[in-house]
Swiss-Prot record:
Protein name in the entry: Long-chain-fatty-acid--CoA ligase
Pathway assigned to this chain's UniProt record: Lipid metabolism; fatty acid beta-oxidation
Protein species of origin: Escherichia coli (strain K12)
CDD domains registered for this protein in UniProt: FC-FACS_FadD_like
Gene of this entry: fadD
Cofactors (names): Mg(2+)
Length: 561
């Protein structure tokens, strides 16, 4: 496909990037911390960590992993925590030790955590105490040999940290009891690491940096193998796209999205490290009043988020009173930005929400609206520099502009494949092209618009939910005979999970089924709607027709609206 979109690029956005500007993420990091040493890198709960402190602490943590635990280059280390100052210390410590980061959603259930730890073969995990009870239930069934435990306030000043840890544990009671007698404290790891020798590993661009887990049509999470080059390429692509709006050493980005999510990991953490910017880490973005209080303290210049976050902020009266004069970049992704939200955002802040599109397998950015756009296009924008894109029909033939087809992409940001899953890799990457499973339309200028999903994936607040996983869990309930899970529109989260159930036990209730799911699934995957049926529609070979149920369910929602 001819790259028609290049003609629509702003004049100062390059058509190609250099993915080999750095040898590794470690090289990028070390150059940035030297250049911006005394500037703030991260702030959380009022505590500032400079680039110099980040360098010192991450070096100590890397040394501890190497010398204290005896881990080697290529070992996998899981990271399970929300946005805290400990996160970047551990993240860059793992990378600087030549090891592979395995990000874990801290809200995972024991079942989900056990699968990810076993699949990745993680030999160590860094976890915040609030979620240690989950790990306790499964750690003996995994290959994890080392548990490094931290508390919410452990990277704050002594007085403040003591207060935070006391309040979190004893007042708010956010730390369920756990028993991990062999765990090492994060503080001890750093203390010991400062006295150990750090040995910088020899890294090449093709070395793995992350195993970033994503769902699959099989319902089993798979690890996308993202190399240092993949991440650096996407970093340069984001920088090329947004760069004209950003000023090195002078930015403060609001990081309300969790850093364990690929969107915030690349665009907030890594990009602003390279630019010498400051990340304002929001630990609990669901506390909108608390988030707004934090925003009022800082002249933030950039913010990233999903539609639900922007909508919640717009509906907060205190947010409406903030000073937006410093803001010059608002980036939305993870889920479609609704037009009404985009229009309200520009009216309040004076800045357009630049919607983009990406997926874990692409580190993540594939396309974004140009920074000079002065309207809400409703599209996912133009392919980013050094990216090829095409739309194909079911026979893999390219379709002309204006016709729907599956979006396929090729570029330096595309993953190596799925960890230990060559079968799944071959299904998604064919002849060098990654098949996204999303059905899109491209207009004459190259703007892409997603019109449907080839896969049955459900998108809840920017998180992928796969029907097979939900169905597998529901079918474990003894009162269920059959089930089908679909996504239906939801004003609060974009989509919500709805299940259609055929009872085996006539006394089965919606409440008991949802309670059962809550024990097995993290919050955003739990069905919000349950409908009991005498039977489910099936094809002539007996396959449940999810699409028919989804269309019917969406029709009901539309009619109610």
């Amino acid at each position: 496909m001819k790259k028609v979109w290049l003609n629509r690029y702003p004049a100062d956005v390059p058509t190609e990037i250099n993915p080999d500007r750095y040898q590794s993420l470690v090289d990028m990091f070390e150059q940035s911390v030297a250049r911006y040493a005394d500037q703030p890198a991260f702030v959380n709960m009022g505590e500032v960590m400079t680039f110099r402190k980040l360098e010192e602490r991450s070096r100590a943590f890397a040394a501890y992993l190497q010398q204290g635990l005896g881990l080697k280059k290529g070992d996998r280390v899981a990271l399970m925590m929300p946005n805290l100052l400990q996160y970047p210390v551990a993240l860059f410590g793992i990378l600087r030790a030549g090891m592979i980061v395995v990000n874990v959603n801290p809200l995972y259930t024991p079942r989900e955590l056990e699968h990810q730890l076993n699949d990745s073969g993680a030999s160590a995990i860094v976890i915040v105490s609030n979620f240690a009870h989950t790990l306790e239930k499964v750690v003996d069934k995994t290959a994890v040999q080392h548990v490094i435990l931290t508390r919410m306030g452990d990277q704050l000043s002594t007085a403040k940290g003591t207060v935070v840890n006391f309040v979190v544990k004893y007042i708010k009671r956010l730390v369920p009891k756990y028993h991990l007698p062999d765990a090492i404290s994060f503080r001890s790891a750093l203390h010991n690491g400062y006295r150990m020798q750090y040995v910088k590993p020899e890294l090449v661009p093709e070395d793995l940096a992350f195993l970033q887990y994503t769902g699959g049509t099989t319902g089993v999470a798979k690890g996308a193998m993202l190399t240092h080059r993949n991440m650096l390429a996407n970093l340069e692509q984001v920088n090329a796209t947004y760069g004209p709006l950003l000023h090195p050493g002078k930015e403060l980005v609001v990081t309300a999205l969790p850093l364990y999510h690929i969107f915030a990991l690349t665009i907030n953490c890594l990009l602003f490290i390279e630019l010498g910017g400051q990340n304002l880490l929001i630990t609990n973005p669901r506390d909108i009043p608390g988030l707004v209080k934090e925003l009022a303290k800082y002249p933030f210049t950039a913010i990233t988020g999903v539609n639900t976050l922007f909508n919640a902020l717009l509906n907060n009266k205190e947010f409406q009173q903030l000073d937006f004069s410093s803001l010059h970049l608002s980036a939305g992704g993870g889920m479609p930005v609704q037009q009404v939200v985009a229009e309200r955002w520009v009216k309040l802040t004076g800045q357009y929400l630049l919607e983009g599109y990406g997926l874990t397998e692409c580190a993540p950015l594939v396309s974004v609206n140009p920074y000079d756009i002065d309207y809400h296009s409703g599209s996912i924008g133009l392919p980013v520099p050094s990216t090829e894109a095409k739309l194909v029909d079911d026979d893999d033939n390219e379709v002309p502009p204006g016709q729907p087809g599956e979006l396929c992409v090729k570029g330096p940001q595309v993953m190596l494949g799925y960890w230990q899953r060559p079968d799944a890799t071959d299904e998604i990457i064919k002849n060098g092209w990654l098949h996204t499973g999303d059905i899109a339309v491209m207009d004459e200028e190259g703007f892409l618009r997603i019109v449907d999903r080839k896969k049955d994936m459900i998108l809840v607040s920017g998180f992928n939910v796969y029907p097979n996983e939900i169905e597998d869990v529901v079918m474990q309930h003894p009162g269920v005979q059959e089930v089908a899970a679909v996504g239906v529109p939801s004003g609060s989260s974009g989509e919500a999970v709805k299940i259609f159930v055929v009872k085996k036990d006539p006394s089965l209730t919606e409440e008991s089924l949802v309670t059962f799911c809550r024990r097995q699934l993290t919050g955003y995957k739990v069905p919000k709607l349950v409908e009991f049926r005498d039977e489910l529609p099936k094809s002539n070979v007996g396959k449940i027709l999810r699409r028919e149920l989804r269309d019917e369910a969406r029709g009901k929602v539309d009619n109610k609206a």
